[in-house]
Amino acid sequence: MKNITKFDLKILKKIQKNLCSPALDKVMIGATKLGTAGAVWIGIGGLMMLSKKYRRCGFTLAAAVSFDVFANNILVKNLFHRARPCDVDQTVALKIRRPFGASFPSGHTLTSVTAATILTLNKKSFGLGAIPLAALISFSRMYLFVHYPSDIAAATALGIGLGSAAYALETKALPAPKEEA
């Protein structure tokens, strides 16, 4: 794990050196706030539930993201106890308050990729907005020096798997949406 952390830190230092700027700081802080506790995705799911046509997708989205938040923060992170980059290398000034808990895997990324997967599988055009937003939220965690690239990669793989499983359950267990009159 030491070699992975060393490699991860090199990437994070390059991001800090080559990309950081006051304007981009604001964008990344905003993106990270959107992803906190899956709030943007749960909100989108809630709005979708108002429509008969998208209710099933909205329910699946809100339920899967809520599950992700719980399972990741209570179970998965406690299995790995990986220190955050901001704790390992304190020479980089944090632009946000230090997040609670362990680093691995990224909860922001997990919820965002799960949501983007569910939305894209339900309707490809939903992915046109969801995938770039998920990518921005995920990248913001590295930019802000609170997650390693390997945290993001693992959460991405897990999110695709969980999103696909949630979609499969949705299509098998929930009634098909009815067209609105």
Question: What does each model-identified segment do?
Answer:
Residues 1-39, 73-101:
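N-terminal transmembrane-helix/juxtamembrane module of multi-pass inner/ER membrane proteins
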Residues 30, 39-42, 125-132:
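Alpha-helical transmembrane segments of integral membrane proteins
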Residues 23-24, 53-57, 123-128:
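Membrane-helix interface segments
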Residues 91-181:
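Membrane-embedded catalytic cores of phosphoryl/pyrophosphoryl-handling enzymes
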Residues 47-70:
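Interfacial segments of alpha-helical transmembrane regions
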Residues 36, 51-52, 80-81, 145-148:
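Short helix-capping/hinge motifs at transmembrane helix termini and TM-loop junctions
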Residues 63-77, 128-141:
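Small-polar-interrupted transmembrane alpha-helices in polytopic inner-membrane proteins
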Residues 47, 67, 71, 75-76, ...:
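Alpha-helical membrane-inserting segments
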